[in-house]
Amino acid sequence: MNSRILIRGLLFVMSAVSFWVYGKEDSAEKDPWVGWHRPVDANVFTTTKGNNHDSVLFVEPELEYPYHLIISHTPQYAHLWRSKKFSWSSADWELVTDQYKIGNFYEYDDGVKVDGVYYIYEGGKVYTYSGPLEKSNGKWKVSGSFPHKQCDDIGIFYENGLFHMFGEHGNFPHGPDGTSLAHFTSKTGLGDWELVNPKAVDPNPDGGHKYGVGDATIEKIQGSYYIFCDRESKGSPYKVTAWRSDSLSKPFQFLGLAITPRSDEVDDWDNYRIQDPDIAYIPELKRYVMTCNMMDKDGNPGGNFSGSGLKGKDTRVIGVFYSDKKLSQKRK
């Protein structure tokens, strides 16, 4: 009798401890915007344009071509695509040019359009252009700067007259990341950046540098602010994680893993890692999409990636992911 009571007591305590330890994470994981899926099994935008990575997606429903996708390629050129209707596949897009010139960078972090002006951020420089993107090749100008040594591989978000920048901060010893994401603001998006919080996103709340983060993308969804960004640790390649806050001026809370590589398979383009997300709302789908850089290292399915800066059997392509949840009404 006593042993039964003791066992029941232990089970109750274990259950209570389990709830206390995991309750917050379990409730966080129920957030609908943590759920993402591949629209098809091989959700690759294109496999024939060599090393593709670090995409920037502009959605402008008022234009004849509402969708423009800039894909980083080499320091010499990026690629510019456009489409009248959204699709995960380049077969439904038009390649404007595969010799698209912004600057001389291997990658471009993020972009935003404000009051008719496009802004692109990379390497501490802010590029701007006004006019149709189809005519922008070679016409981007360096109009400003940002503190990339304190805030690198950034995501940019504009609201109520302020540019909000979130980027890598601190020294992560196991890869090209930060130990947190810092938050800066600017009224112009071109300079006079003010530090709001060096740890707006903190994957190491207990200190140290177990996790590295970077390459943020930011969106306001149903009244809350979401950041999706890379996270890695020693021996664990990039995955896309989700974070949420009810205010841009408050720290973001970890929700969980949003998009992960299929590391237990051998015949996919995303067996090794998934990173560099860029989020946008697609009105015709009534859902959000993310374009991400997917990397594979085993050469299966492989392809012609020679001369594009990759080594051995490495491949890098852009993959498109859809949010599980749709919006039944106009987003706010």
Regions found by a protein language model. Name each.
Residues 1-10:
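Bacterial N-terminal signal peptides that target proteins for export
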Residues 13-21:
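Hydrophobic h-region of N-terminal signal peptides that target proteins for export
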Residues 24-332:
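Carbohydrate-active catalytic/glycan-binding domains of CAZyme proteins
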